[in-house]
Amino acid sequence: MKSLLFTLAVFMLLAQLVSGNWYVKKCLNDVGICKKKCKPEELHVKNGRAMCGKQRDCCVPADKRANYPAFCVQTKTTRTSTVTATAATTTTLVMTTASMSSMAPTPVSPTS
């Protein structure tokens, strides 16, 4: 009986401490979701902090933007990752070509 009461007490404490995804705060008439950061495909609401608080932004999925076009702003994305990936690919190609030419008796021209 004591172990049953202890188990129930633990579950009741965990239900209060761990919210997980049981409650998601909504904003903009239940269209947006309050998050710390919006995904690149989601739209950021200009005055979302008034609805979600200081630490969170109101993020609206791109397919629901037509409902609230005046409030939504497209989030800025950077292309630094693409440039880095291109540079890494070029470096890999140069290294592969150099290692292939040192292994082969005659140099092989790379095809693009």
From Swiss-Prot:
GO biological process, any: defense response to bacterium
Compartments (UniProt record): Secreted
PTM characteristics: O-glycosylated; glycans contain alpha(2,3)-linked sialic acids.
One GO term describing the cellular component: extracellular region
InterPro entries recorded: Beta-defensin (IPR050544)
Keywords: Antibiotic, Antimicrobial, Cleavage on pair of basic residues, Defensin, Disulfide bond, Fertilization, Secreted, Signal
Signal peptide coordinates: 1-20
Region (In vitro binds to LPS, mediates antimicrobial activity and inhibits LPS-mediated inflammation): 21-63
Disulfide bonds: C27-C58, C34-C52, C38-C59
Superkingdom of the source species: Eukaryota
Family: Belongs to the beta-defensin family.
Stated role: Highly glycosylated atypical beta-defensin involved in several aspects of sperm function. Facilitates sperm transport in the female reproductive tract and contributes to sperm protection against immunodetection; both functions are probably implicating the negative surface charge provided by its O-linked oligosaccharides in the sperm glycocalyx. Involved in binding of sperm to oviductal epithelial cells to form a sperm reservoir until ovulation.
Subunit structure: Homodimer or homooligomer; disulfide-linked.
Protein's UniProt name: Beta-defensin 126
